[in-house]
Amino acid sequence: MQWNVPKTVFRLAHRTCMEPHKAGLLGHCQNMKGPLLLYTLESRVVVVQGPQKRWLHLPTAQCVAKERKPFTAVQSQPGVFHHKQWEQDILSKRVLSSSATSSGPPSEKKEDPDPLQDRSISLYQRFKKTFRQYGKVLIPVHLITSAVWFGTFYYAAMKGVNVVPFLELIGLPDSIVNILKNSQSGNALTAYALFKIATPARYTVTLGGTSFTVKYLRSRGYMSTPPPVKEYLQDKMEETKELLTEKMEETKDRLTEKLQETKGKVSLKKKVE
């Protein structure tokens, strides 16, 4: 009986002293804004994350988090956690954008036919594309054929061929016809006028001569036969994909190195503190 009396008094005193502290702690946790960490520790120091960090020395601390987002443990390096998550988001966005860029099928691109064989475009466009692709062959052929055309017209003018009725017949403007009628330059101007009028025929002859010359040079082995356009596009897409993969690996390595450096700096600061 004597033993029970001090024990009962001790329990009453313990409840009287400790219950207000627990109630105050729970009320303080509810009034704090921001995420709170859940812990149940015995006689340890607990850090409560709120607008301000508070160190609490409690025999038993139980706080209820306002947000339902799970926290695995006390974040020993909160700065590193957010930095790592930010870098991972950037890396994933870069990977998705590069893969979306390189995932386009090469078959969707329109295949450009050989301009020497393409009859669906105008004569001038064919001449322009042929000049871009076979310029080294087209220029000599065009110069030779142009010289032949001009020489032929000049010879005809020397022989007294009157082109004025022909120009009037084809509907040439009167201003040009009058210049040829009253011109004192003679055969050269007449030959030049015929040379300009025959431009469509000259382009057609130039394209035909270029096609014949290209075939001849390829048969002799002086020009390489171009691969099919589809295979060419596939090869280009493979090269682009390899380059993008290498750049992605380099970017990933750099981000990993920066992350390791940041971890080292944060851990060093923690040790100093």
From Swiss-Prot:
Keywords assigned by UniProt, alphabetized: Coiled coil, Cytoplasm, Membrane, Mitochondrion, Transmembrane, Transmembrane helix
Subcellular localization(s) per the UniProt record: Membrane; Mitochondrion; Cytoplasm
Low complexity: compositionally biased ranges: 97-106
Coiled coil start-end: 230-269
Gene Ontology cellular component list: cytoplasm; membrane; mitochondrion
Domain DUF1279, first and last residues per copy: 118-230
Membrane-spanning intervals of the chain: 137-157
UniProt membrane topology term: Single-pass membrane protein
Renumbered residue ranges of the record's region Disordered: 97-116, 247-273
Biased composition (Basic and acidic residues): 107-116
InterPro entries reported for this sequence: FAM210A/B-like, FAM210A/B-like_dom
Function: May play a role in the structure and strength of both muscle and bone.
Subunit record text: Interacts with ATAD3A.
Assigned protein family: Belongs to the FAM210 family.
Entry protein name: Protein FAM210A
Organism, as annotated: Bos taurus
Higher taxonomy: Eukaryota, Metazoa, Chordata, Craniata, Vertebrata
Gene: FAM210A
